[in-house]
Amino acid sequence: MEFILSLIGSLLLIICVLVSVAFLTLLERKVLGYIQIRKGPNKVGLMGIPQPFCDAIKLFTKEQTYPLLSNYLSYYISPIFSLFLSLFVWMCMPFFVKLYSFNLGGLFFLCCTSLGVYTVMVAGWSSNSNYALLGGLRAVAQTISYEVSLALILLSFVFLIGSYNMVYFFYYQIYVWFLIILFPMALVWLTISLAETNRTPFDFAEGESELVSGFNVEYSSGGFALIFMAEYASILFMSMLFCVIFLGCDVFNLLFYVKLTFISFIFIWARGTLPRFRYDKLMYLAWKCFLSFSLNYLLFFIGFKILLFSLL
């Protein structure tokens, strides 16, 4: 019975995430429209609300082609695996429904994000296109560079709260949010989240002027839709993780989802306003600035815990 309840909870979660992804794309198009002083999609149905569902139907009913001399199996499997990982990583979040409660939620998140690199790399390589391969290589180098700082910041919090379980963030933020105490850390985490999800200003994987569309250049119809959905699901997840770590983790509160929407809006806002970074500056930022920053914070938290234990 417990297994059936977990299965139903997982299915509900997946459906809710996919519907959220649909409306996040609509929000992005609306916000970008207003940033560029025009209307977003507003013709389909009431104020353009069914637009993302129409786009999904259009994409999945188009002809699925595959490039000549491409690696057929890995070419098709990588978008599916990419979406699967983006949905699977949601399991580590503390939810009210009967889901798997992980004591090692933070570690599970790191494993899933590390595996996400391979899907991009395989998608780029198996397309048999120079543009796709270069885009894939860029995305892999970028993700690996920023994952180091991401893991170190998460490890700092693990030392602070003494557990990998996400629920502990709620206990430690009852009186004051970590955002207020550790504001520089929150800014760095948000920047790393932008880089991890390959979003503006770090969208080198799909630099139009250089790589046409990056690692997904050869994908059409369903394959492209799956990659697109995986990207937006990871944006939502990163927004939720930011709210859990820095904004109180009160997941049973309606205000939590208002905060989640605001952080997702920041991702879109960055896309509408910021220009693309230079690639060497991106790598400089990752290895010279963020790595030293996260290592310093890690040492600070370890020292803080040692001091605390010595006083006790």
From Swiss-Prot:
Localization per Swiss-Prot or TrEMBL: Mitochondrion inner membrane
Function: Core subunit of the mitochondrial membrane respiratory chain NADH dehydrogenase (Complex I) that is believed to belong to the minimal assembly required for catalysis. Complex I functions in the transfer of electrons from NADH to the respiratory chain. The immediate electron acceptor for the enzyme is believed to be ubiquinone.
Enzyme Commission designation: 7.1.1.2
Similarity comment text for this entry: Belongs to the complex I subunit 1 family.
Any one biological process term the GO annotation gives: aerobic respiration
Cystine bridges: none
Alphabetically ordered keywords of this record: Electron transport, Membrane, Mitochondrion, Mitochondrion inner membrane, NAD, Respiratory chain, Translocase, Transmembrane, Transmembrane helix, Transport, Ubiquinone
GO molecular function, one term: NADH dehydrogenase (ubiquinone) activity
Originating organism: Drosophila subobscura
HAMAP family named in the record: NDH1_NuoH
Protein name (record): NADH-ubiquinone oxidoreductase chain 1
Keyword Hydrolase part of the UniProt annotation: no
Membrane topology classification: Multi-pass membrane protein
Catalytic activity: a ubiquinone + NADH + 5 H(+)(in) = a ubiquinol + NAD(+) + 4 H(+)(out)
Top-level enzyme category: translocase
Pfam families reported in the protein's UniProt record: NADHdh
GO cellular component: mitochondrial inner membrane
Transmembrane segments: 3-23, 77-97, 104-124, 150-170, 174-194, 226-246, 250-270, 289-309
